[in-house]
């Protein structure tokens, strides 16, 4: 027997379904991820047409089904029209939506994740074009921190030795590993394991004595940027670090994005498909060092 329920949700994913419907993946505050059919929304005069668009926030009345729920009513509360007017902003919002999808759960409240994602969309919509790369990386770090997997960037995760990047050395590199949990020095043996660490190896996904697979490498300036962003201390309400936009050129932000992308993909074991357009979107941007703080 079907039952109805109410939820407030934002559309994260949409695809055609049947002749005139759409299948939506919705992040709701009350029920987490919900997959629901928007009946007839592809018809020209459908009331659900605009309400089934990406990144629209609706008050929903849903009917629970065996495998898919159905939207009975929807009242729009918020939308982000500015995102679709710029390819870089749209691609960035889709990128953050994928990270949100990979960590969202079904059948239980996701209030903090819902609030965080909507906050990032608001910040992104209000950003200037030069601020978009910062929005992407800052938002990515917030989502990783919310999932409990913010990378360690101030010390080697294997040797625990502090890292002080020599920004004047263009050839210096440090490894970046999801298995290790962040930065890994590329030379030197790991610190010997204690008896407790050896006993814990069987209980974790990545053994502490393993030869960690490095997903990418960071230059000294890229590591310096990550350290300035300070993932370990980042909070949902942390403001956009605008002064850093003038400090680091675009190529450094792009390098950090690439490292974080591979880190997240390795951890979630899922590709970030929208990342394919990131380099194309950001290439025409002016050098960020010319943007006043």
Curated annotation (Swiss-Prot):
One protein family per Pfam: RecO_C
GO biological process: DNA recombination; double-strand break repair
Domain of life according to the entry: Bacteria
Keywords assigned by UniProt, alphabetized: DNA damage, DNA recombination, DNA repair
Signal peptide range: none
One annotated Gene Ontology cellular component of this protein: bacterial nucleoid
Disulfide linkage: none
Keyword DNA damage: yes
HAMAP family in the record: RecO
Family: Belongs to the RecO family.
Record's function text: Involved in DNA repair and RecF pathway recombination.
NCBIfam families per record: reco
Protein name: DNA repair protein RecO
Source species: Acaryochloris marina (strain MBIC 11017)
Lineage, uppermost ranks: Bacteria, Bacillati, Cyanobacteriota, Cyanophyceae, Acaryochloridales
């Amino acid at each position: 027997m079907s039952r109805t329920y109410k939820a407030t949700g934002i559309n994260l994913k949409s695809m055609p379904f049947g002749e005139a419907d759409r299948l939506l993946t919705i992040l709701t505050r009350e029920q987490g991820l919900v997959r629901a059919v928007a009946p007839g929304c592809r018809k020209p005069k459908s009331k659900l047409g605009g309400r089934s668009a990406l990144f629209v926030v609706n008050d929903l009345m849903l009917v629970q089904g065996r495998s898919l729920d159905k939207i009975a009513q929807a009242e729009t509360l918020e939308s982000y029209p500015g995102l679709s007017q710029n390819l870089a902003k749209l691609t960035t919002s889709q990128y953050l939506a994928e990270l949100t999808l990979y960590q969202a759960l079904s059948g239980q409240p996701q209030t903090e994740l819902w609030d965080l994602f909507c906050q990032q969309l608001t910040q992104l919509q209000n950003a200037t074009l030069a601020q978009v790369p910062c929005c992407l990386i800052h938002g990515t770090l917030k989502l990783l921190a919310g999932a409990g997997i913010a990378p360690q960037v101030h010390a080697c995760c294997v040797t625990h030795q502090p890292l002080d990047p020599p920004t004047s050395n263009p050839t210096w590199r440090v490894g970046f590993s999801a298995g290790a949990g962040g930065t890994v020095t590329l030379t030197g043996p790991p610190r010997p394991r204690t008896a407790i660490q050896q006993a814990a190896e069987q209980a974790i996904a990545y053994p502490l004595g393993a030869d960690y697979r490095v997903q990418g490498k960071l230059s000294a300036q890229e590591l310096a940027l990550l350290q300035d962003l300070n993932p370990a201390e980042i909070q949902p309400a942390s403001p956009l670090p605008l002064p850093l936009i003038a400090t680091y050129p675009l190529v450094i932000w792009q390098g950090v994005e690439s490292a974080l992308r591979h880190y997240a993909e390795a951890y979630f074991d899922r590709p970030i498909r929208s990342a394919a357009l990131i380099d194309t979107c950001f290439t025409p941007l002016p050098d960020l060092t010319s943007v006043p703080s």
